């Protein structure tokens, strides 16, 4: 059994910060669950281009608000507490923070190792342990 307290992750290498976002990686590939599990904070008023071409991601909003734009279709969807979106087609998208920080709970498949960073097109490379 794995039990982790978010407070124990803060300030460690499992808390990764970029411009306008913070990802707290609660489960990683080495945990052997077949997916990774993160809490991600998107700062209010920020905009991020992401394209997880090597990963599938499901995201559930538990606080805050913003939008996600599907760059293939131009559709913009509102995100708020209680909304889930799943990037089931490796969807290239723009995530925009709204009037308050968004707190998102995310699952990635394949799981990330914790060493990934976004590259120039907004994706994560596949990293082996």
Curated annotation (Swiss-Prot):
SUPFAM superfamilies: RmlC-like cupins. Gene3D superfamilies: Jelly Rolls. The keyword Nuclease does not apply. It is an enzyme of class 4 (lyase). GO terms for biological process: ectoine biosynthetic process. It catalyses: (2S)-4-acetamido-2-aminobutanoate = L-ectoine + H2O. It comes from the Bacteria. Belongs to the ectoine synthase family. Catalyzes the circularization of gamma-N-acetyl-alpha,gamma-diaminobutyric acid (ADABA) to ectoine (1,4,5,6-tetrahydro-2-methyl-4-pyrimidine carboxylic acid), which is an excellent osmoprotectant. This is L-ectoine synthase. It comes from Desulfosudis oleivorans (strain DSM 6200 / JCM 39069 / Hxd3) (Desulfococcus oleovorans). The gene is ectC.
């Amino acid at each position: 059994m794995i039990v982790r307290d978010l407070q124990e992750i803060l300030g460690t290498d499992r808390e990764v910060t970029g411009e306008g976002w913070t990802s707290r990686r609660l489960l990683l590939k080495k945990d052997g669950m077949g997916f990774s599990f993160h809490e991600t904070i998107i700062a209010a008023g920020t905009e991020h281009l992401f394209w997880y071409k090597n990963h599938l991601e499901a995201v559930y909003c538990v606080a805050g608000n913003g939008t996600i734009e599907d760059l293939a279709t131009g559709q913009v969807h509102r995100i708020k507490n209680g909304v889930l979106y799943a990037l089931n087609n490796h969807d290239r998208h723009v995530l925009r923070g709204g009037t308050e920080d968004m707190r998102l709970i995310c699952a990635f498949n394949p799981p990330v190792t914790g060493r990934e960073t976004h590259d120039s097109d907004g994706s994560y490379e596949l990293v082996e342990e």
